Amino acid sequence: DNFSDEQLKEFVDHCHRNGQKAGIYWVPFTDWFRDPERKVEGTDTPYREVYLYANGKEQSLDGAWAIDPTHPAVKKRIDYFTERFHRAGFEYIKIDFLTHGAMEADSHADPNVTTGIQAYNQGMKYLLDAFKGKFYITQAISPVFPSHYAHSRRIACDAFAAITDSEYTLNGLSYGWWLCNAYRFNDADHLLMFREGITEGENRARVTSGVITGIYMNGDDLTLAGPKVAKERVKKFFTNAEINRIARIGRSFRPVYGYRPTANGRAENFFVLEQEQVVYVVAFNFAKDRPLEYTLAFSDLNLDPARTYSATELWSGVNEEFTMELKGQVPPADVQVWKIKKL
């Protein structure tokens, strides 16, 4: 909203000169200004006419007021912004706070719509058509279903650099790993490497939490004015070829067990992904004050207990052979990623 059309185009051109594609963020079904008399962009309609009301009061969630996806002015607003994005040359968009569009209301502009999800479907179909098949679309805060309006959906909300942030993301993966079968990808969203006091073990865990979710991006300040250590950490931990090879698979790992988090909001420690020739196994230690010793039976990993397998830990490069079970020890606030050869 703060950029002119010229500034948006300048940003896109800058990305293209760097061999990158440009992405943008937008919220189609919310009014963060909460200004009833402000005109809906691209129209002469005041926002008070497009709000969703429940018992006569504006529907509010997370500090923003919900707007009606079925209202003609809201659809013109979608046209106004998506046309700007097309003209500038964007090819990726993250659409957020979509849940607002699915909120129940006293009524909708379309009298045939009687539920929030009906309204959401109508608005999302209109939005998808406005993108004209030229955007990669990722959803953030949104209903899980319907799932056919976006390529990917964020597995959790904002997370940063600490081991607790990795566990927060992995709480979403522990229970939502199967959503990579509803969306093309589960999206781990931005990963940060630099915060004061963050260890390299936490960096490894943070990158791994994104890689095993499906797709990920870096959120550090890598500008010339940004901290030097952020650039050093990103260069060190985002360039492991074997780790990035997992990310290119684009599939979510599933929990080895699926029932062992120690409390609400906690995550599984062990995740697995089986491929034709290899099995990847990941062990996280969320504790900051003690190592994690573990033993995983081959039968739990769909491996033959009668065989001996060669394995490589991908962060350290250590090679081992295992029979009947996978054993290891993860240092505090760290991770191990094993690549086990099946053949």
Regions found by a protein language model. Give the residues of each.
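Solvent-exposed beta-hairpin/edge-strand motifs
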Residues: 299-317
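Short, well-ordered coil/turn segments that N-cap beta-strands
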Residues: 18-20, 89-91, 131-135
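Carbohydrate-binding surface patches
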Residues: 210-213, 217-218, 260-303
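Aromatic- and carboxylate-lined catalytic core of secreted/periplasmic carbohydrate-active enzymes
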Residues: 207-262
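Aromatic-lined carbohydrate-binding/catalytic grooves of carbohydrate-active enzymes
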Residues: 1-83, 92, 100-110
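Conserved, mostly hydrophobic/aromatic
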Residues: 15, 137, 212, 281, ...
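Glycan-recognition surfaces
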Residues: 39-76, 80, 118, 122-228
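C-terminal beta-strand-rich structural cap/linker in extracellular carbohydrate-active enzymes
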Residues: 320-343
